[in-house]
């Protein structure tokens, strides 16, 4: 077998494979064995049909089977090439003692990574975030430690109402009966709850609702109305929250520490996402238009199979505009992936089995299974293992890059305006 490079366009390479007589003879023998298990020719026992008879009776079809077996030799020649698309056969022919196959391969494109320090990400002011967090948590604690006093008057904003809700179908059959408690807010507009405003203990509210063409009656009986008194913000509140606290300041410090843990995790993830979004801006890539065209067509065909194409395209000026945007998104995704791959290799970043197990344990609650089951699942499934490996690798590379980017400290949302922030790096 001879392999010749016929054409190269950036990451797209056209290869010609020429097979000799010996390779063709071996492929023909495989075709004979394969066909003998599947075809019947009058006058010959199944499985005993000679090669010359199969070639004569099947003609071009036999040649196609022979070419199929010859092509089984091609993958080994490509194993050292990192491909982003499956090889595409553009030509193949078999003549006498020579066979020729032309294959188009699309390799991972080369990238040139620019100055990471030119990327700017935003970080919300930590001190102000924690200040607001502590304030909010203290209000939550006041709400949860409110003193309840039964009242005779009608329910109003701030009160807690306990009701027994019964649900009946159109035939009057009771389907469910359950107790609920609601705290009535200012400008209450929640379904059912808004109907409790002004009601007293013993009052009954009936509400008709229709779901999927069926009518239901909801009967809410007010069992009790409570006036809620929120505790004052002070040392006594701290003591009621936890007997380890003697003062309000101790409670605030504990809440601040709690908020800091949440802040660190969420802010790191936010900065990773910002960095990932902006990475394509500093990356130059050598990729063929043909590669992008194939990837765009594959994405569109996938959307069509899922029945989502028409709906998505309808939000664009034209199909061409959609194709252009899809092409840009795919190009940016390739840039991001290649940067992660290249930098991971350059920096010697990898993912070991212990890290995969830890990731599986952390994801187990979200998957609704035990940590041991999650680890077993990851070991058993190569696709899942690779998915987690890539997620961890990407996180590691991004965390390394975050040490080089510009960080702009900004106000928490809802505070101030769009004024300039301050740089943290």
From Swiss-Prot:
<dbReference type="Pfam" id="PF05698">
    <property type="entry name" value="Trigger_C"/>
</dbReference>
<dbReference type="GO" id="GO:0003677">
    <property type="term" value="F:DNA binding"/>
</dbReference>
<dbReference type="GO" id="GO:0044183">
    <property type="term" value="F:protein folding chaperone"/>
</dbReference>
<dbReference type="InterPro" id="IPR036953">
    <property type="entry name" value="GreA/GreB_C_sf"/>
</dbReference>
<dbReference type="InterPro" id="IPR008880">
    <property type="entry name" value="Trigger_fac_C"/>
</dbReference>
<dbReference type="GO" id="GO:0032784">
    <property type="term" value="P:regulation of DNA-templated transcription elongation"/>
</dbReference>
<keyword id="KW-0697">Rotamase</keyword>
<dbReference type="GO" id="GO:0043022">
    <property type="term" value="F:ribosome binding"/>
</dbReference>
<dbReference type="InterPro" id="IPR027304">
    <property type="entry name" value="Trigger_fact/SurA_dom_sf"/>
</dbReference>
<keyword id="KW-0413">Isomerase</keyword>
<dbReference type="InterPro" id="IPR008881">
    <property type="entry name" value="Trigger_fac_ribosome-bd_bac"/>
</dbReference>
<dbReference type="GO" id="GO:0003755">
    <property type="term" value="F:peptidyl-prolyl cis-trans isomerase activity"/>
</dbReference>
<dbReference type="GO" id="GO:0051301">
    <property type="term" value="P:cell division"/>
</dbReference>
<dbReference type="GO" id="GO:0061077">
    <property type="term" value="P:chaperone-mediated protein folding"/>
</dbReference>
<dbReference type="GO" id="GO:0043335">
    <property type="term" value="P:protein unfolding"/>
</dbReference>
<dbReference type="GO" id="GO:0051083">
    <property type="term" value="P:'de novo' cotranslational protein folding"/>
</dbReference>
<dbReference type="GO" id="GO:0015031">
    <property type="term" value="P:protein transport"/>
</dbReference>
<feature type="domain" description="PPIase FKBP-type">
    <location>
        <begin position="158"/>
        <end position="231"/>
    </location>
</feature>
<comment type="function">
    <text>Involved in protein export. Acts as a chaperone by maintaining the newly synthesized protein in an open conformation. Functions as a peptidyl-prolyl cis-trans isomerase.</text>
</comment>
<keyword id="KW-0132">Cell division</keyword>
<comment type="similarity">
    <text>Belongs to the FKBP-type PPIase family. Tig subfamily.</text>
</comment>
<keyword id="KW-0131">Cell cycle</keyword>
<dbReference type="InterPro" id="IPR005215">
    <property type="entry name" value="Trig_fac"/>
</dbReference>
<protein>
    <recommendedName>
        <fullName>Trigger factor</fullName>
        <ecNumber>5.2.1.8</ecNumber>
    </recommendedName>
</protein>
<dbReference type="InterPro" id="IPR036611">
    <property type="entry name" value="Trigger_fac_ribosome-bd_sf"/>
</dbReference>
<dbReference type="GO" id="GO:0005737">
    <property type="term" value="C:cytoplasm"/>
</dbReference>
<keyword id="KW-0963">Cytoplasm</keyword>
<dbReference type="InterPro" id="IPR037041">
    <property type="entry name" value="Trigger_fac_C_sf"/>
</dbReference>
<keyword id="KW-0143">Chaperone</keyword>
<dbReference type="Pfam" id="PF05697">
    <property type="entry name" value="Trigger_N"/>
</dbReference>
């Amino acid at each position: 077998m001879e392999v010749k490079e016929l054409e190269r366009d950036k990451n797209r390479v056209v290869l010609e494979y020429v097979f000799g007589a010996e390779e063709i003879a071996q492929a023909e023998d495989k075709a004979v064995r394969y066909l003998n298990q599947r075809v019947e020719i009058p006058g010959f026992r199944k499985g005993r049909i000679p090669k010359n008879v199969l070639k004569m009776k099947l003609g071009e079809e036999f040649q196609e089977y022979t070419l199929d077996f010859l092509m089984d030799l091609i993958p080994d020649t490509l194993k050292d090439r990192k491909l982003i698309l499956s090889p595409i056969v553009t030509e193949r022919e078999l003549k006498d003692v020579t066979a020729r196959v032309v294959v188009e391969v699309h390799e991972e494109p080369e990238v040139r990574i620019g100055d990471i320090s030119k990327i700017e990400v935003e970080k919300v002011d930590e001190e102000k975030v924690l200040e607001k967090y502590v304030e909010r948590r203290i209000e939550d604690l006041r709400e949860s430690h409110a003193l309840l006093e039964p009242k005779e008057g009608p329910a109003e904003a701030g009160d807690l109402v306990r009701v027994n809700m019964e649900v009946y179908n159109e035939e009057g059959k009771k389907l469910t009966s359950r107790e609920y408690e609601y705290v009535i807010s200012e400008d209450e507009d929640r379904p059912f709850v808004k109907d409790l405003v002004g009601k007293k203990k013993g009052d009954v509210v009936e509400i008709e609702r229709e779901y999927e063409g069926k009518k239901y009656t909801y009967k809410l009986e007010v069992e009790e109305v409570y006036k809620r008194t929120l505790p004052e913000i002070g040392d006594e509140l701290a003591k009621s929250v936890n007997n380890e606290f003697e003062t309000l300041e101790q409670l605030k410090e504990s809440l601040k520490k709690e908020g800091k843990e949440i802040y660190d995790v969420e802010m790191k993830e936010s900065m990773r996402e910002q960095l990932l979004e902006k990475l394509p801006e500093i990356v130059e890539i050598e990729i063929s238009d043909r590669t992008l065209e194939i990837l765009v067509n594959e994405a569109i065909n996938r959307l069509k199979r899922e029945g989502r194409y028409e709906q998505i395209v309808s939000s664009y000026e034209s199909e061409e505009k959609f194709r252009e945007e899809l092409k840009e998104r795919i190009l940016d995704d390739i840039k991001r992936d290649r940067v992660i791959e290249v930098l991971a290799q350059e920096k010697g970043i990898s993912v070991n089995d212990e890290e995969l197990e830890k990731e599986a344990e952390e994801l187990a609650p979200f998957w609704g299974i035990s940590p041991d089951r999650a680890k077993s699942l990851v070991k058993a499934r190569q696709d899942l293992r690779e998915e987690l490996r890539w997620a961890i690798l990407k996180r590691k590379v991004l965390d390394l890059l975050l040490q080089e980017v510009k960080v702009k400290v900004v106000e928490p949302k809802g505070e101030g305006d769009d004024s300039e922030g301050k740089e943290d790096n």
